[in-house]
Amino acid sequence: MFTMKLNNRTATKVNTELVDNRSIDFYVKSRHWLSNPNKSFFKLFGQVVESENRHQISPPSKVYDKVKDKVILIQQFYVDKIPHRHTENKFCLKQNVNNKFIDKIILLNEEIYTNEQLGLKTQSSKIQQINIKTRLTYKDVFYYINNLNLKGYIVLANTDIFLDDTIERVKQTGLSQERKVFCQLRHEYNGEKQLSSCTLHLNRPDTQDAWIWHTNSIVTPKQQEMFDYRMGKNGCDNKTVYVFSILGFACHNEPTIIKIYHNHTSQIRNYLNDGKIPGPYYSIHPFVSNMPPPNNLNTFDIVRENQTLHNYVLGKLEKNQVFIIPRIASVENNMAMYGNYYNNQNKDILNKIRAWAPTMKKNAGILLNSEAAAAKYSKLYLSAFNKCERYFSWEPWNNYVKHIPDSFDFILANFPKPKFDTLALDIFHSIPREPWTRALRGKRVLIISPFKESFESKVHIREKIYGIDLFPDCELSFIKPPQTQADNPSRPFDVELDEFMKRLYNIKDTFDIALCSCGGYGNLVCAGLFDMGKSAIYVGGVLQMYFGVYGQRWLRDRPDVFKLYRNDTWSRPKPSERPQGFASIEGGCYW
């Protein structure tokens, strides 16, 4: 491997076979599991696998009546000092100039190039060069779309990408009517005489080299700030899927509908030594019609998951049907599995119960003073999964699941029911759409949370937190659950639980549904409320973000959300809402 300085860009000659082989196993197997999750994800891999990306399979598009707006291609052209690489880039530009279905090409360059440098014999009326004097960012693209008053279908593509006649199909994809973006996987062009011979880049099916949307989908100046990172930098494609998603775009990757071609036989890379854009990252695997359809219980698509949750809750409430939605927790899930096996008198199980008991007290607030108490906790925890129709589950490569792979499989195997993606509860990702909580319209909603005082102080300004009211026409009430985590004192968990359930029973006629955030008591409280004839949803720690009460976890993991929504109504929890030793709970993640 060697490096060289090229036109202010560091290029690296790489063994791409090695790079692809390091990643291909995960992408092939995760695609297989997404398409047909008929066995344990971990057994498929033979190990616990973690990915920093969320993975989903693209939905298919419908065919719409043709809307004949202009197709505008935006790229940044540059002159590479490696002749072979420069020839590849010139070839792509020439192909795009000759494409009769591309109406305009905007080149946002670091300098203005001559026709010879562009690889053109004569000036093309299609091309407009603008000297932006720097490497192109996605934010720049939106600025120039507005500045040039561009209207129509925008195709943003890397320099080494060219399109064929299938770009005409974009006019029947509904982009002008819907807030939707195509994030397209490429075909590899290696000098083939017939483009039909080019194959998809299935070694990394989650990558994108072109993004297509319509200017009717407005991106506000504040939203444009979310795209303030360079094109071509490592991770930019998966970051862009995430940003489009949280701005309300339905993301599609349909490479056989609209084809893009990658001309890169030189294998010169300009980003491998350039760091990586900070996450989160979304990987959208392509929809290919001749592959098995994704299992509808495992879409992991925030648009579809939010809508499915919204519709389920709305349907239940409209029919006055009592329901609960528990969730797979973390350390509590492990304890539920170990406690379930307690009667076997297995020494290994007994040792694990004893080993996990301190963490149960510290993180989940559950004091287990004997192995028999663990068995009782397990029975109550698992009863929630028996009583529900659906429950929340993590994607199996999630950072949380690596700590609970056995108990994760235990729940899925013993409760083969439809699931919601737990991250559908991240309400801040669904603000531009119809957040699932709006299905609660007009209901009496009980909020169970340790941040009762903080929430109560924001009821009258709740529509300012995200710019919409997450609980329209709702009558909100609040109750604080047992505060027994960290160094706070606690009685045995069942004593704390019984006392709290009596408090809930005494007010059961004052609410229609409860949203729960109460540590290790969450699933147990949901099950108990169901027995009272009340509905409940175990939302978990993220419930505090519904009221703009944030902690370290969201500052760390969701910086884009803060950039987009944070305002003077947001706050930390009140000092009185911190348990003793709160910093010992995942670094004080809730505070």
Which residues are covered by each model-predicted region?
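C-terminal functional extensions of proteins
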Residues: L524-W591
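N-proximal low-complexity "stem/linker" segments adjacent to membrane-targeting elements
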Residues: G46-T87
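Conserved catalytic core of nucleotide-sugar-dependent glycosyltransferases
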Residues: I161-Y242
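Short beta-strand-to-loop acidic/aromatic patch adjacent to the donor-nucleotide binding site
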Residues: K151-D164
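Short, acidic, metal-binding catalytic loop of nucleotide-sugar glycosyltransferases
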Residues: F91-I102
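C-terminal catalytic/acceptor-binding lobe
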Residues: V67, I72-Q75, R85, Y229-E305
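Electropositive, gly/pro-rich neighborhoods at or near active sites that engage anionic ligands
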Residues: D301-E475
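Active-site-proximal specificity loops/subdomain of glycosyltransferases
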Residues: L108-G152
